């Protein structure tokens, strides 16, 4: 990375070598004393001289590393500690605030690479996808005390579809061997204990990328929409619902706002989560990618999925041989779960927009069976108004538009019963007022202070302005923490009221 400093190849094992130098030097001085029998005073003076050099070395060392703590006494943690010295903005970042409520992410890159008029990632290439929309960075992640958790070279992309136009953008941070030969993966668990979902429950100790999801209007207007949604989904039985971690994000030392970190939803991420050996065995496609961005990056996978959709929508769902074919190509239970939880979350940006599916080659292992499965993602617009909740239910259960397969599945009486049973069970497990209130309390406790800081920062205009083409802000556009509290109360009330609306739809027949 020619425009960034290179990380050193050594770690804090250097302190051990300083100590060894002290011992060896002391012995050397004693053995080479002018007298065959050196006096105690001479020996002490020689040792003190060497000891002074040792102390000076330590002072120089720790002046570089800013007296930060080491995350744990392991070679990996010591190396991260030593690399964190190369975050030239860290001192100013930590001096700018009395405390941090969550993680701190510091990104360094050449300013022209990010903001150049012709080729800047954030100024000119924010609609580019793939490697064309990626630039080299150095990324540092710290905990609240300033302990470095991640320090390495990586790639940066804009995350999202139409939201790429927003002033405040979301990012995907990607580890690659070409950027950092010593660290081709991230190795610190930012989500406190993720494990594989294949039944082995192995700790996920390495991963290829993570998302920095921005908090802004008019998307995740409260700052907790996504975290509340994913937390409720996990309680409802959606095992792959993303964990979220609040963070303050800085680029070249400048505060960008309140964000939260979450695992990526890519073929690499699926391989890590489901313990799939070869990511090449995985097929992932965003069904409406072309409608949202103008291009479809995986047309052959989309064609395969739409062939299955066409088969399903025209199948006789009472024929046992047809059911066998369906179940060989679709994880029906997971599909019904996916629809049920989206309806209970009141997701208003889903059926005709955020639809992503995946499957893995049949390797005879859990989740490696050739069956299509659905992603739960992008929960910015959950907690919809009553009318939209009812409309969503009717569209999801009755209309085949937008490649919707639920109506076809519900033609099978057993699937229909399973679907309604899932809704009732989810309501009991996750969507009672008590559970909803506990989730809100937890997520707000984690995010409140960072959002409060954000609202007082220069980055706040990025929170308010959705598009780079937005009109200049006026006084009426600004919101306060009191306004945000009203939004949170509305959000909470919509979620609490949704189960009764869904139950009424079920009772009226569908």
Region spans (language model):
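N-terminal Sec-pathway targeting helices
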Residues: 43-55
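Middle-to-C-terminal accessory/interaction subdomains
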Residues: 80-85, 89-95, 100-129, 137-138, ...
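Sec-dependent signal peptide cleavage junction
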Residues: 64-73
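Conserved ATP-binding subdomain of kinase catalytic cores across diverse folds
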Residues: 133-292
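Short, Lys/Arg-enriched N-terminal segments with co-localized hydrophobic residues
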Residues: 18-43
């Amino acid at each position: 990375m020619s425009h960034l400093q290179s990380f050193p190849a050594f770690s804090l094992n250097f302190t051990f070598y300083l100590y060894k130098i002290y011992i060896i030097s002391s012995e050397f001085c004693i053995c080479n004393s002018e007298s065959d029998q050196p006096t105690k005073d001479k020996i002490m003076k020689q040792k003190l001289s060497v000891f002074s050099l040792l102390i000076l070395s330590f002072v120089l060392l720790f002046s570089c590393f800013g007296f930060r703590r080491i995350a744990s006494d392991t070679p990996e943690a010591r190396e991260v500690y030593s690399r964190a010295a190369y975050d030239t903005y860290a001192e100013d970042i930590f001096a700018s605030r009395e405390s941090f409520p969550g993680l701190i992410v510091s990104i360094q890159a050449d300013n022209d690479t990010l903001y150049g008029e012709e080729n800047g990632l954030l100024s000119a290439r924010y609609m580019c996808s793939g490697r064309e929309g990626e630039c080299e960075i150095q990324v540092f992640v710290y905990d609240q005390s300033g302990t470095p958790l991640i320090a390495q070279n990586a790639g940066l992309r804009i995350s999202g579809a139409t939201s790429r136009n927003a002033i405040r953008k979301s990012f995907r941070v990607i580890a690659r061997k070409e950027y950092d030969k010593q660290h081709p993966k991230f190795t610190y668990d930012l989500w406190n204990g993720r494990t594989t979902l294949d039944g082995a429950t192995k700790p996920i100790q390495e991963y290829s990328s993570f998302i920095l999801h921005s908090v802004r209007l008019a998307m995740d207007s409260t700052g907790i929409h996504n975290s509340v949604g994913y937390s409720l989904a996990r309680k409802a039985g959606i095992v792959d619902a993303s964990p979220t971690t609040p963070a303050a994000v800085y680029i070249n030392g400048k505060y960008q706002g309140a964000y939260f970190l979450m695992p990526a939803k890519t073929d690499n991420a699926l391989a890590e989560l489901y313990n799939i050996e070869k990511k090449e065995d995985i097929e992932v496609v965003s069904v409406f990618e072309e409608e949202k961005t103008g291009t479809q990056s995986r047309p052959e996978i989309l064609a395969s999925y739409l062939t299955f959709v066409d088969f399903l929508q025209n199948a006789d769902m009472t024929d046992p041989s047809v059911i066998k074919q369906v179940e060989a190509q679709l994880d029906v239970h997971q599909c019904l779960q996916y629809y049920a939880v989206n309806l209970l979350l009141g997701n208003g940006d889903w059926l005709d927009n955020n639809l992503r599916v995946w499957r893995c080659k049949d390797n005879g292992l859990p989740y490696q069976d050739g069956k299509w499965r659905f992603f739960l993602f992008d929960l910015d617009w959950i907690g919809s108004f009553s009318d939209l909740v009812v409309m969503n239910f009717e569209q999801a259960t009755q209309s085949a538009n937008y490649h919707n397969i639920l109506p076809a599945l519900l033609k099978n009486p057993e699937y229909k019963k399973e679907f309604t049973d899932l809704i009732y069970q989810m309501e009991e497990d996750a969507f009672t007022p008590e559970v909803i209130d506990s989730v809100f309390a937890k997520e707000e406790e984690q995010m409140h202070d960072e959002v409060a800081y954000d609202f007082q920062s220069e980055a706040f205009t990025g929170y308010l302005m959705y598009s780079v083409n937005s009109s200049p802000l006026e006084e009426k556009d600004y919101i306060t923490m009191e306004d945000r509290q009203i939004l949170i109360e509305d959000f909470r009330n919509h979620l609490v009221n949704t189960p009764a609306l869904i139950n009424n739809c079920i009772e009226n027949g569908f």
